[in-house]
Amino acid sequence: MDGNGRWAEQRGLPRRAGHRAGAKSARRIIEAAARSSVDSLTLYAFSSDNWSRPREEVSHLMHLFKRYLQSEISRCIENGIRLNIIGRRDRLNPELVKIIEQAETLTADGERMLLRVAVDYSARDAVAFSAHYTDPNCTCLSGGNERACFEAALARQMHASVPAGDVDLLIRSGGERRLSDFLLWECAYAELVFVDTYWPDFSEHEFEAALKDFDGRERRFGGAPVAERSTHPQAEAPHYQ
C-alpha cells in the first residue's frame, strides 16, 4: 500500500490525509478481493523501518490502524473474513495489542477469505528470528523436512495464526519496483505486478486487471516451459547427500 504520503503532497494536503485516503482504498480492495474469490490477501500497512518516520506521523498511523480495526470487525464477521495481524507486537501499544487479539478472536470463524495485515513487520527479521528459535527437537527435522520445521517457527514468530502459504501474486502501488522487505520467504515464486498509481487512487478495476494479468502467466516453479515439457521427458531432481 505505497504512495499515501506522495498522494497527499501532490494535493497540498498533510500526509495524514493520504493515510486516511489509503485506509478507504484498503476497504475497497478487500471487498474486491472477496468478490473475486481470493483465498488470502495480505496488506503491508507498517514496516519495521517505518518507526524511523516523524513521531507525529507514526502516532497518527497507529491511531488510524486502531480505529480501522475497531470499525472493520463487524464488517469482517458479516462477510466471513478472518483477520490476522502479522509482525512484532512487543513494540506496539498494549491497548492496540488487545484490540488486535480481540479482532482475531471475533473473526476466527471466517472462511470466505483470510485477511492478513502486516504491522511492525520485517521479512528479514522474521527469517532471522525463526532461524534462531527453530526447535531442535522438532519432529520435522528428524524426518528430513527442515523447511516445514522452519516455516512453523516463522509462523510463530510473526503471530501468523493461520498459515497463508506461498504468495501467488504481489501487487505494489506507487511506482516503486522492489520488495522492500515484504514476505521475502513466501514470495520465492510470486508473480510481481508494479503499478504507478498511488495507493489512495488504486481502484477495483486495477486490482482486477492485475488478477487477469496473473491468470495469463505461465508459472513454472523452476521447471521447463510447457512446450519443452511436452517434447522432453521429465528429469528427476538430483539427490544431495
Give each language-model segment a name:
Residues 1-241:
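Flexible, compositionally biased loop and terminal segments
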